[in-house]
Amino acid sequence: MSKLFWAMLAFISRLPVPSRWSQGLDFEQYSRGIVMFPFIGLILGGVSGLIFILLQPWCGIPLAALFCILALALLTGGFHLDGLADTCDGIFSARRRERMLEIMRDSRLGTHGGLALIFVLLAKILVVSELALRGTPMLAALAAACAAGRGSAVLLMYRHRYAREEGLGNVFIGKVSGRQTCITLGLAVIVATVLLPGMQGLAAMVVTCAAIFILGQLLKRTLGGQTGDTLGAAIELGELIFLLALL
């Protein structure tokens, strides 16, 4: 199980993980690592939250919010943001399904993808600033948001099909069992409720799961399934929705 955790950490983040820690693990086994997603989100969000706490006394809330969101993007190598941009480029092209998938595979950034990145990053910075002004514990909020975003992404894997013939998303999409889905969501709920006591964390998690479930259904109807890009989009939007739900 520890090998699976390190493999997942290396897979969806840019944190340095020695290869020997996940040695001997086949790529096909990665689908079992979905239950680790909330914990990985907890780590990434925790680092982002610490950066906010350390910088806020020195440069104020707005700049601290900017740098903590920048740190989160760097920690993931922009992996999920790239998926968000590609998804928006494809979906909003208003082309046939096959052409949408081709556009999503194109490495060039389009207008819709650029607008999506600007909107999501700016929205995150603004909502983090507003939460801090309201006295929200930002270490807990950011850690819980990242756990919720990654945990809720399982809703785009369970009982969904892969929209392409091959790709990284094929490791998870359609390969996750109902038991793994329940465990992943349950762990994300536990993280959110422990870090944000009372109904605040639980309510934000419910809102996030509902929004991501609807997103998954809309993407399935439009693309005929999910891709690695749509998973990245779900994670980014899940984080933002969770933070907005805390307001």
From Swiss-Prot:
GO terms for biological process: cobalamin biosynthetic process. The gene is cobS. It is a multi-pass membrane protein. GO terms for cellular component: plasma membrane. HAMAP family: CobS (MF_00719). Coiled coil: none annotated. Belongs to the CobS family. Pathway: Cofactor biosynthesis; adenosylcobalamin biosynthesis; adenosylcobalamin from cob(II)yrinate a,c-diamide: step 7/7. It is an enzyme of class 2 (transferase). The keyword Signal does not apply. It holds the Pfam family CobS. Its cofactor is Mg(2+). Keywords: Cell inner membrane, Cell membrane, Cobalamin biosynthesis, Magnesium, Membrane, Transferase, Transmembrane, Transmembrane helix. The chain crosses the membrane at residues 34-54, 59-79, 113-133, 138-158, 187-207. It is found in: Cell inner membrane. Its main location: membrane. GO terms for molecular function: adenosylcobinamide-GDP ribazoletransferase activity; cobalamin 5'-phosphate synthase activity. Its EC number is 2.7.8.26. The keyword Membrane applies. This is Adenosylcobinamide-GDP ribazoletransferase. It catalyses: alpha-ribazole + adenosylcob(III)inamide-GDP = adenosylcob(III)alamin + GMP + H(+); alpha-ribazole 5'-phosphate + adenosylcob(III)inamide-GDP = adenosylcob(III)alamin 5'-phosphate + GMP + H(+).
